[in-house]
Amino acid sequence: MSSYLFTSESVSEGHPDKVADQISDAVLDAILTQDQRARVACETMVKTGVAIVAGEITTSAWIDLEALTRKVITDIGYDSSDVGFDGATCGVLNLIGKQSPHIAQGVDRKKPEEMGAGDQGLMFGYATNETDSYMPAAIHLSHRLVEQQAKIRKKKNSPLSWLRPDAKSQVTLRYENGVVSAIDAVVLSTQHAPGIKQKDLIEAVREEIIKPVLPAKWLHKGTKFHINPTGKFEIGGPVGDCGLTGRKIIVDTYGGWARHGGGAFSGKDPSKVDRSAAYAARYVAKNVVAAGLADRCEVQVSYAIGVAEPTSISVTTFGTGKISDDKIEKLIRKHFDLRPYGIIKMLDLIHPMYQQTAAYGHFGRKPKEFSYLNGEGETVNATAFSWEKTDRAAALRADAKLK
């Protein structure tokens, strides 16, 4: 019998790298609200007392960058010097320039469907049927732990009012013959106010954060819990560590279970295939698994800058396919348009929905209907996490001629 351990981690919305991601995506959202043709590549750095927002942006929109940055920081919970960082008083430095016209000439075309990729690169998408979210279980549970930490922290009259925004989680699972059999270890580190006794913190975190999230069927007497194992975690957020956009690409995707092309997501408009093609690859892989064509599926796509058609599409199902990987690849080419314009249209990506992707994972989330007012004051309806739909599974299954 094959037995092995696998570990994934996640971080909270108050982790400094995630603060940076959320600022970058808030800038993108604010611009897309007014200008759907904008080109945005926004990078953020946060450190004690300052947020630096830089990058290349070409747009007709105007946004109050300073006010927007401050709002993101305070909404996360960094709203006082008592927590070490205050969005109301920190410095905000604007270092934004315009996108190179040489890139623009390769992307923008007279015919929208001929739109070229914004850069070269390779992207991966993955799905598995081991969880209802079609995500690997370790990253799924790691996200839910830090999400629960934030939920309890922000709750009115919270029993854990001493929680602070910064937190990290890690889950180690035991697999037997490729199937999750148990949770071997859990790590939960959370920033907290001074004066909290370690014993009280451990008990509260276990009862209010860990127990509501982890499946009881996978817990056993030997499961190890490491809660704030250093003893104190009072200094956190941008004071404890410098935060940068794009530093949590494994947390953002599949927790190390699938391969990664190296490109980050946050702060990039959908013309950047680092983001849009990774979303499309997840959409494809999830529909393949939801269709029952495989238990696990990884899809790779690649692009050349200024070229519309992908330079490659490849599929691997790790021996779990009900039909051959070659046949699945042919079905993908038939049912999905993976040119940049095709992806944007297929997933309806040009809407202000990206800040909510910047914490707790870009994948494994439920599609969410919402509406907003655009630059003309019109109400627009849209769907966030559209790449999590399984609306093409039935057609794939029928075309594969599976009963």
Swiss-Prot record:
The entry assigns this protein to a family as follows: Belongs to the AdoMet synthase family.
Q: Which GO terms describe its molecular function?
A: ATP binding; magnesium ion binding; methionine adenosyltransferase activity
**Locations listed in the record:** Cytoplasm
Q: Where does ATP bind?
A: H15, D166, A167, K168, K232, F233, D241, R247, K248, A264, K268
Q: Which GO terms describe its biological process?
A: one-carbon metabolic process; S-adenosylmethionine biosynthetic process
Looking up CDD domains in the UniProt record yields: S-AdoMet_synt
Q: Which UniProt keywords apply?
A: ATP-binding, Cytoplasm, Magnesium, Metal-binding, Nucleotide-binding, One-carbon metabolism, Potassium, Transferase
Q: What is its EC number?
A: 2.5.1.6
Details of cofactor binding? Binds 2 divalent ions per subunit. Binds 1 potassium ion per subunit.
Tell me which species this is from: Stenotrophomonas maltophilia (strain K279a)
**Required co-factor?**
Mg(2+); K(+)
Primary localisation category:
cytoplasm
Note down the stretches annotated as region Flexible loop.
99-109
Pathway in which this enzyme or protein is active: Amino-acid biosynthesis; S-adenosyl-L-methionine biosynthesis; S-adenosyl-L-methionine from L-methionine: step 1/1
Query: GO cellular component annotations, sorted alphabetically?
Result: cytoplasm
User: Source organism's superkingdom?
Assistant: Bacteria
Where Mg(2+) binds, per the record, is at D17
Under catalytic activity, the entry for this protein gives: L-methionine + ATP + H2O = S-adenosyl-L-methionine + phosphate + diphosphate
**What is the name of this protein?**
S-adenosylmethionine synthase
Listed binding positions for L-methionine are E56, Q99, D241, K272
Q: What does this protein do?
A: Catalyzes the formation of S-adenosylmethionine (AdoMet) from methionine and ATP. The overall synthetic reaction is composed of two sequential steps, AdoMet formation and the subsequent tripolyphosphate hydrolysis which occurs prior to release of AdoMet from the enzyme.
Q: Which residues bind K(+)?
A: E43
Which PROSITE patterns does the annotation name? ADOMET_SYNTHASE_1, ADOMET_SYNTHASE_2
UniProt gene name? metK
Listed under subunit, the entry gives: Homotetramer; dimer of dimers.
